[in-house]
């Protein structure tokens, strides 16, 4: 359920035209209501900004491959990091080391695909894919 909470938080940010750019365990808080909340928007930016990133941003291991070059961060960048976070919550390691078996495997693989065009198109789409496998 935590990952779905984070999908909803990202969908809200993305609908406001904001990309987080630093999804990682340290930027997630579990509330007293046992919900996941996304923290630290210090390197967030507008999705529609014409400016390209001029330096690598994000956290090593969670940053999408495109964040290591000079490019524009976007929704797919956040979804990649959320896929890494999901994998880490399940296996304890980065998806490059191990990926869970079963139906979640496909979700992690799609979210962390190195080709942006193959990732989920939105956080809402990722939440829909996760919903059948999560107890809310």
Residue ranges and their predicted role:
Residues 14-30:
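Catalytic-loop of the protein kinase fold
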Residues 2-3:
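Activation segment signature within eukaryotic-like protein kinase domains
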Residues 53-66:
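Conserved activation segment of eukaryotic-like protein kinases, specifically the C-terminal portion
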Residues 78:
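Conserved catalytic-loop aspartate of Hanks-type protein kinases
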Residues 100-114:
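Conserved C-terminal C-lobe helix
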Residues 119:
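Conserved HRD-motif arginine in the catalytic loop of eukaryotic-like protein kinases
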């Amino acid at each position: 359920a935590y990952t779905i909470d984070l999908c909803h938080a990202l969908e809200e940010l993305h609908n406001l035209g904001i990309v987080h750019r630093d999804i990682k365990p340290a930027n997630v808080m579990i509330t007293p209501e046992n919900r996941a909340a996304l923290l630290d928007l210090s390197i967030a930016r507008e999705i529609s900004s014409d400016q390209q990133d001029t330096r690598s941003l994000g956290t090593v291991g969670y940053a999408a491959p495109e964040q290591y070059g000079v490019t524009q961060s976007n929704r797919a960048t956040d979804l990649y990091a959320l896929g890494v976070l999901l994998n880490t919550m399940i296996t304890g390691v980065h998806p490059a080391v191990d990926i869970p078996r079963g139906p979640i495997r496909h979700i992690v693989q799609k979210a962390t695909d190195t080709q942006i065009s193959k990732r989920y198109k939105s956080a809402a789409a990722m939440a829909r894919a996760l919903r059948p496998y999560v107890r809310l």
